[in-house]
Swiss-Prot record:
Glycosylation sites: N82, N98
Designated gene of the protein: KTR6
Protein name as annotated: Mannosyltransferase KTR6
Species of origin: Saccharomyces cerevisiae (strain ATCC 204508 / S288c) (Baker's yeast)
Region described as Catalytic: spans on this chain: 115-446
Similarity-based family: Belongs to the glycosyltransferase 15 family.
Pathway where this protein functions: Protein modification; protein glycosylation
Length: 446
């Protein structure tokens, strides 16, 4: 019995030895190692994977290449910065220095490695504006344009905007950007109280009389409209909340956009060297603009250095004379360079106009002040009419008459309601001065 058991144990040990020996041979076979590295290693955590051995010489080579690449990048960055600074200096010099209007604006037209323009939407909210109108205008701009570009919004309000209204605005913009927080940039600010009152040199009794005498002019009896006109003409661009921006797009409560805008308008303005873009123009009531042209001519005589040689005075004067024609770029849609208003020339012009008191003694609007300033202080080719943007405000419409444009941008407006070439508009006058071809059918509108 014991002998039989010993034989079984010996046989078991022999078989086990042979199995272990075969297993060791298999594990150490080259093909087995290759399969192990191919199928097992990739699934190991990085901390457990074998670290490739690099020779000291190879390590020095890699480090040297990294240092060389970093140095090259640093030198390229410095070269680009130096080239940019030199380009700015040369451009400013070519315009006659940074005291000139164009010279002052040069830095805002320089692209830094393809970075987008420093631009934003500006919406002024007064006590007269409803949240329905405000949210409508936000939705129009976000859906038709900004969902593709994510430019910031700046809301400047008359008094503090309460938390509920701010949240409604945030939610409207957030929803249009699919809730992506990285694409949402909203700023709220207040109009300084001293910029929404009569300035100290205004005779308030005389100003009150104009509210009565101009009651037959749209908003002619409104003091608030005059405060707003003065603020937009001379102060909104000074607000610290806009200091970081070069470009603005004014968005008034209640506006509508009729066409899709698939290209970056800010980038286009910057790349084309434009300063101001508009969609609607019209002739303002003569009674509202009493004496403003006389003051403008006096300014031009006192400060001839600010008047552009190739200016756009022909847009604001009659074809057969130097008389003022009351044409204005309607301010409910503006895309412009903030640095134009910040320039020494426009500051001087606005102060000159403001001290005359015509904003309150008559009804000089921000539209007419902007228009005269732009037309006198800039070359005419810096001002652009956006004929491919369908726009609506109040009872006025800009609807592209060019069928190709109308179809390309999915416009949903009635071309028969376009105001550009109608009586009371200055659109036809603009086309004539700029020698632009008018779209087919422009003369068949009532």
């Amino acid at each position: 019995m014991h002998v039989l058991l010993s034989k079984k144990i010996a046989r078991f040990l022999l078989i086990s030895f042979v199995f272990v020996l075969a297993l060791m041979v298999t594990i150490n076979h080259p093909k087995t190692k290759q399969m192990s590295e191919q199928y097992v290693t990739p699934y190991l955590p990085k901390s457990l994977q074998p670290i490739a051995k690099i020779s000291a010489e190879e390590q020095r080579r890699i480090q040297s290449e990294q240092e060389e690449a970093e140095l090259k990048q640093s030198l390229e960055g410095e070269a680009i910065r130096n080239a940019t600074v030199n380009a700015i200096k040369e451009k400013i010099k070519s315009y006659g220095g940074n005291e000139t209007t164009l010279g002052f604006m040069v830095p805002s037209y320089i692209n830094h490695r393809g970075s987008p323009p420093k631009a934003c939407f500006v919406s002024l909210i007064t006590e007269r504006d409803s949240m329905t109108q405000i949210l409508q205008s936000i939705d129009e701009v976000q859906v038709k344009f900004n969902k593709n570009f994510a430019y910031p919004w700046v809301f400047i309000s008359q008094g503090e905007l309460d938390g509920m209204k701010q949240e409604m605005i945030r939610q409207a913009i957030t929803d249009s950007m699919n809730g992506d927080p990285e694409l949402i940039n909203i700023k709220f600010a207040e109009i300084p109280a001293d910029e929404w009152v009569y300035p100290e040199w205004i005779d308030e009794n005389k100003a009150a009389e104009s509210l009565i005498s101009l009651a037959n002019v749209p908003d002619g009896d409104s003091r608030a409209v005059r405060y707003q006109a003065r603020y937009f003409a001379g102060f909104f661009w000074r607000h610290p909340v806009l200091d970081e921006f070069d470009w603005y797009w004014r968005v008034d409560p209640g506006i509508k956009l009729y066409c899709d805008i698939d290209h970056d308008l800010f980038r286009w303005m910057q790349d084309e060297g434009k300063v101001f873009g508009f969609t609607l123009s019209m002739s303002e009531a003569k009674e509202a603009n009493e004496k403003i042209w006389d003051v403008t001519k006096k300014f031009a005589k006192d400060f001839p250095k600010f008047i552009s040689e190739n200016n756009f005075k022909s847009f604001i004067t009659k074809k057969d004379s130097e008389d003022f024609n009351n044409c204005e770029f309607t301010s409910n849609f503006e895309i412009g360079n903030l640095n134009f208003y910040r320039s020494p020339a426009y500051r001087k012009f606005f102060n000159y106009i403001d001290e005359e008191g015509g904003i309150f003694y008559w009804k000089w609007s921000d539209s007419i002040i902007h228009t005269i300033g732009l037309s006198m202080l800039l070359p005419k080719d810096k001002i652009h009419f956006f004929e491919n943007i369908g726009f609506h405000y109040d009872k006025y419409n800009n609807c592209p008459l060019n069928d190709d444009i109308w179809n390309q941008y999915n416009c949903n407006c009635d071309q028969g309601n376009d105001f550009t070439f109608r009586s009371g508009s200055c659109g036809g006058h603009y086309f004539d001065i700029m020698k632009k071809d008018k779209p087919e059918g422009w003369d068949r509108l009532p």
